[in-house]
């Protein structure tokens, strides 16, 4: 057992235990800081708070007769601005937005804005570069539910010389008006938001989740919206009851999401957990998701944004996460007009999600929409409806059910045709599945270029529930169906086993090369 520091500030640290486990251990371990018991935890990745700046600490983890130690020194901090001293009350009655915003704007480089215990009623906060924002234990940022008290971001603004546009607002892959998020970063860098507190969107079916198909004023806000940002870290705190997507980094890079807890009701609409859109160099580690839509959805805009900015999402690592109750555990799409590449998912637990891996695309995403080099390794799935889904006929768009999108015949490859290649699934065990082992479907005119499965074990629940494996026209509900694979040029299966299925283990059509051993 080894212990390493993966993130450190002047007041906090996140550590990772290297012991070959996924997300958590069977037993709790004891964490000692400089010889004193700090807490007990069974988590592989955990955080420490309440540390002092520029101070050396020895951390010892004891579990089942084993010990692991590490020593580190916390970083520098210039000054702390306590929002109470700036005028915030934290009584849940006063609108504290302006007071917290004043503290953020007044905070110098390498300073800390401290939000102590209390309930702070707010609308939208805006970050600035080179600061640290701490949500202390017991601190709650309680978002106002009156949408018309939030600022509005226009979708696209024409430049003064009429030669360029400035994109600010976004909704599901298009430049559209949106309400500002609860916490916003616009072109900021070197920011850490950390602590043991809570951001509560206070969304419910009486406000933000009511009549979600109608835009009223603007589209719904995200909990945290980061646009064109660099070097941003979110560490340790809790988020719940989001109006829509919880974390939405947009055209940003150098992002770290560590040891966060994200919860929304299972029936809450469009409450994705973390949706990096046209982002690169993203680390997602130690997060717990339990929500009403995709846990993680990697995107890059619809065809207009893909053609205009040609900014794929790339170099994304997801590890040691627990994903529960969502539609998809890790989803790519469906807004992927600029493509997605180099995604690695490892050492994760998927529990009670509709799908494990979920790739959603369709004709019309464009030739820049290349989804490539996506790998899953050392994954456990429990009670997942369908472990692997690749759907090239996704119908959830205004034109998603048109003949062009849903035609099963090979159409000409043109500037509207997306591509999928190099998908890898290794060391995966999925138990108590329900609908199908997989549903992997490329386009007949642009087949998926290589799928490899190695050391994959799938078994079905005895009382398997029926469901539709993929959101495309003509797919009927089923249960305990085997590996369905269509329109793939190369399929390689090494040590792949399936038990409890009805009928054939593999149902394949239009496969150019199949190798099994």
Which residue ranges define each predicted feature?
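Extracellular/periplasmic carbohydrate-active domains that bind, remodel
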Residues: 1-517
């Amino acid at each position: 057992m080894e212990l390493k520091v993966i993130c450190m500030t002047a007041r906090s640290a996140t550590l990772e235990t290297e012991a070959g486990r996924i997300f958590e251990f069977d037993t709790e371990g004891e964490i000692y800081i400089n010889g004193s018991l700090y807490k007990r935890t069974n988590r592989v990745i955990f955080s420490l708070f309440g540390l002092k700046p520029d101070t050396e600490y020895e951390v010892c983890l004891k579990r089942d007769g084993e010990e692991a130690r590490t020593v580190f020194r916390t970083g520098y901090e210039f000054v702390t601005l306590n929002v109470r001293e700036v005028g915030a009350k934290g009584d849940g009655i006063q609108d504290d937005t302006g007071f917290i915003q004043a503290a953020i704007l007044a905070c110098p480089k390498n300073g800390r804005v401290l939000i102590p215990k209390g309930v702070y009623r707010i609308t939208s906060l805006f970050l600035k570069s080179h600061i640290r924002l701490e949500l202390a234990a017991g601190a709650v940022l309680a978002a106002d539910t009156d949408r018309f008290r939030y600022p509005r971001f226009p979708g696209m603004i024409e430049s003064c010389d009429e030669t360029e546009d400035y994109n600010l607002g976004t909704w599901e892959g298009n430049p559209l008006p949106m309400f500002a998020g609860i916490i916003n970063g616009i072109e900021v860098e070197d920011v850490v938001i950390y602590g043991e507190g809570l951001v509560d969107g206070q969304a419910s079916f009486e406000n933000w989740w009511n009549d979600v198909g109608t835009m009223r004023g603007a589209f719904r806000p995200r909990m945290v919206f980061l646009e064109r940002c660099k070097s941003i870290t979110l560490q340790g705190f809790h988020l719940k009851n989001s109006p829509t997507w919880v974390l939405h980094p947009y055209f940003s890079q150098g992002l770290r999401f560590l040891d966060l807890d994200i919860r929304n009701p299972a029936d809450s609409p469009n409450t994705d957990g973390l949706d990096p859109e046209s982002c690169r160099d993203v680390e997602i580690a130690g997060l717990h998701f339990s929500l009403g839509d995709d846990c993680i959805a990697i995107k890059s805009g619809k065809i207009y944004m893909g053609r205009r900015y040609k900014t794929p999402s790339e170099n994304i690592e997801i590890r040691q996460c627990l994903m529960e109750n969502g539609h998809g555990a890790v989803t790519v799409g469906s807004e992927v007009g600029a493509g997605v590449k180099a995604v690695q998912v490892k050492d994760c637990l998927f529990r009670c999600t509709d799908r494990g891996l979920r790739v959603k695309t369709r004709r019309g995403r464009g030739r820049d929409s290349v989804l490539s080099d996506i790998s899953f390794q050392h994954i456990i799935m429990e009670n997942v409806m369908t472990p692997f889904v690749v759907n090239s006929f996704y119908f959830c768009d205004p034109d998603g059910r048109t003949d062009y999108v849903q035609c099963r015949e090979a159409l000409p490859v043109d500037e509207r045709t997306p591509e999928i290649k190099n998908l890898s699934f290794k060391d995966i065990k999925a138990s108590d599945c329900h609908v199908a082992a997989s549903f992997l479907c490329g386009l007949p005119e642009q087949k998926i270029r290589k799928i490899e499965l190695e050391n994959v074990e799938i078994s079905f629940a005895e009382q398997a529930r029926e469901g539709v494996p993929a959101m495309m026209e003509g797919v009927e509900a089923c249960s305990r169906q085997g590996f369905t694979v269509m329109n793939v040029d190369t399929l390689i299966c090494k040590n792949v086993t399936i038990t409890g299925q009805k009928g054939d283990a593999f149902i394949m059509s239009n496969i150019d090369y199949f190798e099994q051993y």
